[in-house]
Amino acid sequence: MDQIKKIIDNFKQTISSVDNQKELIVTKNIFVKKHVTPLFQQLRELEELAVKKAFGKELNFLQEAIQELFEEKNQQLVINLDQNQKPAYDLMIPALDLVDGSIHPLNLVVNQIVDFFKKFNFTIVNYPELVTTKHCFDDLNIPLDHPGRSKTDTFYVSDKQLLRTHCTAGTIEAIAAMNKHKDIRVISFGNVYRNDTDDATHSHQFMQMDFMWVNKDLSLSNLKWFVTKFIEHMFGNDLKTRFRLSHFPFTEPSFEVDVECWNCQSGCFLCKKTRWIEIMGSGILHPKVLEAAHIDPEKMVGIAAGIGIERIAMLKNNITDIRDFYFNDFRFIKQFYE
């Protein structure tokens, strides 16, 4: 206990000459790191339980004493500041001109997407980010052994609830609510979550958009035409597109949609030397998905597609690191305008 009292007296003497709050905080942090933290290291190394318990009580007393001295000194500095110093801001100085802000690049992309779907009378829906396994997986024909359902890939809150891994969890709810309509057009967008390690091209949270269009007269040619028009709206009319056969549990057939790289003719870093850039997934809604929404797949056909908002923004603006969108660095954000 003598050692503890010496440390307390030392701290009291150390802060006695401090004359501002910022210096007080820095002084306390340095003192604790130098004199207190090593004692906790010693505590962890003790093996005898009784000795460890007694030493732990002394360290708790030390922490409380240091915090009490810190708060007393801080209160004293506040009083001195009120009595002796002028206000930090001179209200008589004329204000500087306000600088116009700018819209976040992800919101710019969302606005552009919404403009396109409004022209085709789509209903925009927004559902909670906390969803059930029924809406996120079961209704979308995603089997129990699918990797996306594992706890290593998905953020579960309970056995039956999770943070949505795609916006389709909300879109399927929307078409189910409209299942008596002869023509159903729904778009959903918002945050989705995957248990990924954050790096230049991956994020545990990102934005996604998807749409479903259900009608008795739709076909594969309608899907190709509509997706092509969407890509032209987002990237311009001069890009070639291609549809590659793929597999998604909720569509059959399924396609990955690529656009010709606008940065090169023979391969570059952007297209990974392939001359093509993957844009989105699409397909004809699987009959089981329509049945889950209580829609007769013998009478109705659905087309669907989904895309990452960050991916569009990165491709449109040659951004190489997805994390730039989330650092809130105004130097980055102010570059983008409608």
UniProtKB/Swiss-Prot annotation:
Bound cofactor: record note: Binds 2 magnesium ions per tetramer.
Membrane-crossing residue ranges in chain numbering: none
GO molecular function, one term: ATP binding
Gene3D superfamilies the UniProt entry points to: Bira Bifunctional Protein, Domain 2 (3.30.930.10)
GO biological processes: phenylalanyl-tRNA aminoacylation
Catalytic activity: tRNA(Phe) + L-phenylalanine + ATP = L-phenylalanyl-tRNA(Phe) + AMP + diphosphate + H(+)
Cellular component annotations (GO), alphabetically ordered: cytoplasm
Residues that coordinate or bind Mg(2+): 252
Cofactor(s) in the UniProt record: Mg(2+)
Broad class of the protein's primary localization: cytoplasm
Protein EC: 6.1.1.20
EC top class named in words: ligase
Signal peptide (residue range): none
InterPro entries in UniProt: aa-tRNA-synth_II, aa-tRNA-synth_II/BPL/LPL, Phe-tRNA-synth_IIc_asu, Phe_tRNA_ligase_alpha1_bac, Phenylalanyl-tRNA_Synthase
Record note on quaternary structure: Tetramer of two alpha and two beta subunits.
Protein's UniProt name: Phenylalanine--tRNA ligase alpha subunit
Organism (species): Mycoplasmoides gallisepticum (strain R(low / passage 15 / clone 2)) (Mycoplasma gallisepticum)
